[in-house]
Amino acid sequence: MTLPSRIPDAAEGQAFQEQLGSDQDGLVSVGGRHGRGGLRTLPQLADPARPAFSSRVRQGFGRSAASYEAQARLQQGVAWRLGRLCRDLPLPAGPYADLGAGSGLLSRALLAQRPSLAKPPLQLDLCPELLARNPLAGPTTAPWDLNRGLPPQLRDAGLLLSSFALQWLDDPLAQLANWAGRLAPGGWLALAVPVAGSFDTWQAAARAASVPCTALPLPEADGLIEAAIRSGLNLRHTQRLSFSRAPRDGLATLRLLSSLGATASRQPPLDPGQLRRLLAHWPAAPLRWEVLVFVGRRSGGAPSLPAAPSPPDGPPC
């Protein structure tokens, strides 16, 4: 195991935690957001009982909205791939929506590859700062917390898309089932989500340092696939992708995630001493993501298309 070239002292560790919002946030794993909304009049988000974690997710992405797209190379590449998979789908009548649209990466990738789309997807996201940077979100598009389910305008949807958003929800499996249930017969759900197996270097460092791992727990790929099938989806394409970045020390990794806004954690933040131990034990190994991509169709439409081949890579990840 190789140590980082420089370990911050206690004061620097405290300053770094404050930079990430240590009063509310921990140090967390990957997030991501994606996103002309055909439907414009969403209710304003004003639920005083909204879970605290949901609020921390919004705040993290809001603080980093200006730097998000410059850092989100993986999210851009996955968005392009998912858009390619949706390029030739026979879409039934009904609304389209991008769930967790953020700055609009996924919907823009879809429209670039399917410019004849009848209408652009509605942009749904909790973070107003990201929606303000989304060229597909109209001025009346209000934030929406996907933990509340989907707005009534999305009943009998023809296409629901989501990339790097489901993992931030309180119950990903239940929300996946809810999304599938809102499709029209023959409607499509296209999903990309980071899954368990990601960030193994972070987990290894936490074990070696005997500190809590504050990375976001990610859903199991098999559980998501099973939930989709139980919800009545016929899966046309299912693929588990692995992505990695060159080895970097722990501090650089956490700063990268901070620049994306992925700073919310379900765990209390590490204290400065714990942070120093974590960074000292961080292995010199690639940072790895495991991403599940699937496209499924709700039963009741025309016969499903043959299984789609893997699309060519788009912009580099």
Question: Which residues fall in each region the model found?
Answer:
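N-terminal, positively charged/glycine-rich alpha-helical extensions of SAM-dependent methyltransferases
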Residues: T2-R6, G13, G26-A65
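Conserved alpha-helix/loop element of class I SAM-dependent methyltransferases that forms part
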Residues: R73-A93, A109
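Conserved Class I S-adenosyl-L-methionine
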Residues: L74, S103, H237-C317
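Class I SAM-dependent methyltransferase SAM/SAH-binding core
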Residues: Y96-L150
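A short acidic, Gly/Pro-enriched loop at the edge of an enzyme's catalytic core
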Residues: L150-L160
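A short SAM/SAH-binding and catalytic strip from SAM-dependent methyltransferases
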Residues: G158-P172
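A short glycine-rich, Lys/Arg-flanked "PGG" loop and its adjoining helix->strand segment in the class I
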Residues: L173-W188
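Conserved catalytic/acceptor-binding region of the Class I
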Residues: G186-R248, A262-P272
